[in-house]
């Protein structure tokens, strides 16, 4: 790529509206797949949706999937390439992206702070094979702030405030855990560290849609500005059968009475499930790290 020209983009519609960036790659692959250069999820993109190549002050757009159009030029069929003058708006899936170039000489005169990144990736992580998953931002360059007062001087990268990121991630993780608990997803646990929210656990095929809705809630709450590492998988292990509880004692040492026998917290049942805790109207059982709620 010509060092005097950089390719910039701005999302002008969709979930990531107003997101801006600068890519240092001469050719960038855009899609929802993990191996794309710029990855957007929840926007109806194919894993490899389209490819852009900067050619001076024009942009070559190659359609790799259906559902792509250039404003003013109409739809582009899969496999077709179109060269358009910059700036240009590309419509893909549920989003629209404005692409433009800016000379390096003029970029230093802009006083408004602008995010400059070599690759912006919303990296899809986790193996939940249904719906659309959450995203994680991965910046391969430090953010650079332009300042009109620094004329002729080298710009230094502005390092992120890790403490602020950690506090934001911790607050978001706490809210996400509450939402997960409200959805009855007892096998999902949330943690936060170094500005990243991590999700681990399992869901059944029946409860997968509930987890999908929680992810959508998180995405819209954070507007894609917070990293979410998704480690949730589908596990359809057979749930324990109903418990024929004869009596329940919920005092300082709670226990169940089943077939005349007392089962305290930590006791093993016949099918290998362990009594995790006793709650009002239900017993939480655990086996191999999985929790199951059984009413009584």
Curated annotation (Swiss-Prot):
<dbReference type="Pfam" id="PF21934">
    <property type="entry name" value="Yop-YscD_ppl_3rd"/>
</dbReference>
<dbReference type="GO" id="GO:0005886">
    <property type="term" value="C:plasma membrane"/>
</dbReference>
<protein>
    <recommendedName>
        <fullName>Uncharacterized protein y4yQ</fullName>
    </recommendedName>
</protein>
<keyword id="KW-0614">Plasmid</keyword>
<dbReference type="Pfam" id="PF23893">
    <property type="entry name" value="Y4YQ_C"/>
</dbReference>
<feature type="transmembrane region" description="Helical">
    <location>
        <begin position="117"/>
        <end position="137"/>
    </location>
</feature>
<keyword id="KW-0812">Transmembrane</keyword>
<keyword id="KW-1003">Cell membrane</keyword>
<keyword id="KW-0472">Membrane</keyword>
<feature type="transmembrane region" description="Helical">
    <location>
        <begin position="82"/>
        <end position="102"/>
    </location>
</feature>
<keyword id="KW-1133">Transmembrane helix</keyword>
<dbReference type="InterPro" id="IPR053946">
    <property type="entry name" value="YscD_ppl_3rd"/>
</dbReference>
């Amino acid at each position: 790529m010509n060092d005097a020209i950089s390719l910039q983009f701005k999302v002008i519609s969709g979930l990531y509206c107003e997101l801006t960036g600068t890519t240092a790659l001469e050719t960038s692959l855009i899609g929802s797949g993990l191996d794309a250069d710029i990855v957007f999820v929840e926007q109806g993109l194919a894993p490899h949706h389209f490819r852009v190549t900067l050619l001076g002050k024009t942009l070559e757009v190659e359609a790799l999937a259906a559902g792509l159009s250039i404003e003013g030029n109409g739809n582009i069929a899969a496999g077709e390439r179109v060269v358009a003058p910059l700036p240009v708006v590309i419509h893909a899936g549920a989003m629209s992206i404005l692409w433009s170039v800016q000379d390096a000489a003029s970029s230093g005169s802009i006083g408004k702070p602008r995010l400059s990144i070599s690759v912006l990736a919303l990296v899809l992580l986790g193996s939940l094979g249904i719906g659309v998953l959450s995203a994680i931002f991965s910046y391969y360059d430090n953010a650079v702030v332009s300042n009109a007062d620094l004329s002729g001087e080298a710009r230094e990268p502005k390092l992120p405030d890790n403490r602020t990121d950690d506090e934001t991630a911790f607050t978001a993780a706490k809210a996400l855990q509450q939402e997960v608990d409200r959805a009855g997803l007892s096998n999902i646990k949330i943690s936060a560290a170094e500005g990243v929210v991590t999700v681990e656990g399992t869901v059944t095929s029946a409860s997968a849609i509930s987890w999908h809705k929680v992810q959508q809630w998180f995405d819209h709450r954070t507007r894609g500005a917070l990293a979410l590492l998704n480690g949730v998988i589908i596990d359809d292990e057979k749930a324990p059968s109903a418990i024929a509880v004869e009596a329940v004692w919920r005092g300082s040492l709670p226990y169940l009475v089943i077939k005349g026998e007392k089962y305290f917290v930590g006791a093993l049942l016949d099918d290998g499930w362990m009594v995790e805790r006793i709650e009002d109207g239900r017993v939480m059982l655990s086996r191999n790290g999985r929790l199951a709620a059984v009413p009584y």
